[in-house]
Amino acid sequence: MHTSTSFGHQMETFGNHLTSMTAAPRGGDLCLMDVNGTVRFLTAEAGFGIPSGQVQTEKGIAVRQPCVHWDGKRALFSMVIGGPAKRYDVSYQNNRWQIYEITNLDEVVNQGKVANIVKLPGQPSYNNVSPIYGSDDKVIFTSDAPPFGLAHTYPCLDEYESTPINTGIFKLDPANGTVTHLSHSPSGDFDLFLATDGRILSTRWEHLKRDQQADETRFGSNDYEIKTFESELASAKPIVAPQTKDGKPFADSRGVPYEVFPEALSAEDPTRDPNEPLHDFNEFLIWEVSEEGEGHQTMNHAGRHEFGGLYLAASKKNDPNLSENFSTITKNKYHGTVSSDAGIFQLKEDPRPGQQGKFYGTWSREFKRFASGRIFEFTMPKGFNPQNLEIIDWTHPDIDNSSNSKGHFRNPVMLMNGTMLVSYATQSDLFSPSTTYHFQIAKMEKVSSTPSNTEHKASDRLTGAGIERTIKYWGDPAQPLEAVVKMNEVDIVEVTTRQRPAKIPVHIEDIEKQVLQEEQVDENQLRLWMKERNLSLIVVRNATERDAADLQQPFNLRVPGGVSTTPNGGKVYDISHLQIFQADLVRGYRASRPGRRVLATPLHNSTQNPSIESTNLLDPTGPQGSVKIGKDGSIAAFVPATRALTWQTVSPTKEPIVRERQWITFAPGEIRTCPACHGINGKTKAGNDIPQNKPEALRDLLRTWKSDFNDLITSVPEGDVKSEGGVTLYQNHPNPFVNSTEISYQLSKAAHVTLRIYSAQGQLVAILKDQKETAGTHKVRWNSASENSSQVGTGIYVCSLQVDGRVVSNKMLSIR
């Protein structure tokens, strides 16, 4: 329905998960339209919601983002229930968007039955939106649940406006309530879609920059009462630091340390390097990740050099080799038509046979457009080089320019019969209380004789004059607010069967696999060891090589005493270390702005990763949280899993040289290779192919791991008891066992417990517990059932107990 504001609205580009009456107006319905144009209101038929003309109180609903199952017999959607019950009531805003399922969609469609709508069990008690089915029928969604259960950091705040944001992509197994955080997004993921090749695609808000609210407080006129906490612990105190450290500016006049990554945002920042331009970043790009949380990157490794903007500032002012202009390697005409505060939304794949890898999306600006703009098409299947990307405009490219008279489009959906439907609003100006948008479903119709020969327009609306309702709800006035409005028709999906996607298998590159074999390291044991400690392994083969399209950061690079890559004459940069940063929720503001924002913090021990520093080959002579770059240019490090990370190469004098511009998340147990510095799409800047060297840094790390950290149990123990930090895991009984066994453990204090069973090869078999437990002794019986309810066979299994970052494990023997 219509609203008086667009900021934070459920149809907007970001912050669209909130539940106020302006953000999520109550009074809507989940609708079903048949081929004759007849509309049914499924939620109303099932007893949800309040009819038009009545006050939207405790039973008022808003709905969004349906997703039909592969077999067409079920459907997911998100719904928030409850509006203000009386004048001045704001308590309803504590109600959350939750995921619901229609379990009999085929009967609803074919037999006219009432939808059986049930709330999915086990989902987080936070705002859960954009639900989709996984290839294995698990449910994938975005949520504003705080990472690692850090409830005191709620709501997590974005890196731009410091407003509430979702924290990334999650996966729910409805069978047992297990929730997995697949990707941690400091500024939010939106519009999830599972492609036929198994990639979860999402629009991700890119904002890796310093805190502009902090700069406004320090150098502007608005005091946000910024504070940086000592850690993410609920008991952590705000830091009060000296203003200088080692003779350099360190903290402001209140003792709040300045941010350290990336470059300065304000010209008044005393930590600013005068040889570097100010750094700001605001763009929406498409990202991909597997259903297991691996392979997280921009879609096909396509970034701003392929998809966005008009130019990027060179990172070093005194280096004439660097340029603010894009490389001509990527000739995509899209570059000239977008700005830095925009991006791609509502991406959907063409479902027709033979069209896999073809996608349709909406290009929209950031504010006051309800994530609407122009429609375009591109083909980019998995493995496609994005330097060859071509954009096909389906609508006039001048949408959002002053000359636009074409209206605004969103939610493109290609039907199985080759018809494209969109949500269309005739309004061409920006949203305002006097210029409100009204979206209706329309068919796209090709316009003849246009320069592009691909331009389409919206034909007649499928609902005619639209769906009109009288909406009433309580606000501040003595009587309920009332308006007669046309309802927005958005989030279109076709009810049909679709190809179930292939699942992307766990992967390791051949070269790194060969190094593991040469060092006699069992890949599965290494993965299991990392999973138990919530770790991932990242590998770079040659950090002196750069992608040919990146002209903005240094590419004449040299490891002192080692490899060098210098495709151009001029300045050569020595790189000696990779400094790793983790997204810590430690920035807070005044009491009227609760929650936490992430800050890029050098890699360090934490509750979730209590021994990350000793696990790595960190160099105390380098910058904090850094590992040495090998003479061959290689890098290897264990890093926190399920937490956003970024990094930079630095010189022997600790000068940042090449910075990562995005936050990346890795899955527990993932072994991830980046062949060069930021990856290579085609050729390197030196004209070389992707590096094929065996990374010596990986070899060094594996040798240390084997001698110091490989504490996996190698035999079935007799009556073994493992204890660590107030956590005791007793040997299962009986052991060996037939059919079932009892597992006991003791906690010295209340804590969140995750009890997992792994195979001897490191594959997850079952999750027996994933919840908060009281202090004392607890017992769990395992009936030999795996995650898919099948019975396990004879063999050795590992029982792993994780409690607040500490992990203890025992082996068990099953006899069938």
Predicted regions and their residues:
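Conserved blade-ending motifs and adjacent loop-strand segments that build the rim/top face
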Residues: L182-D189, H305-G309, S340-F345, N388-M416, ...
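Sequence context surrounding c-type heme c attachment/ligation sites in exported
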Residues: V485-K486, S626-I713
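Short, conserved, GDST-rich strand-edge loop motifs in beta-rich repeat architectures
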Residues: M1-P25, S78-R96, F141-T163, W205-W287, ...
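Loop/turn-rich, solvent-exposed surfaces of beta-rich toroidal or solenoidal domains
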Residues: T337-N453
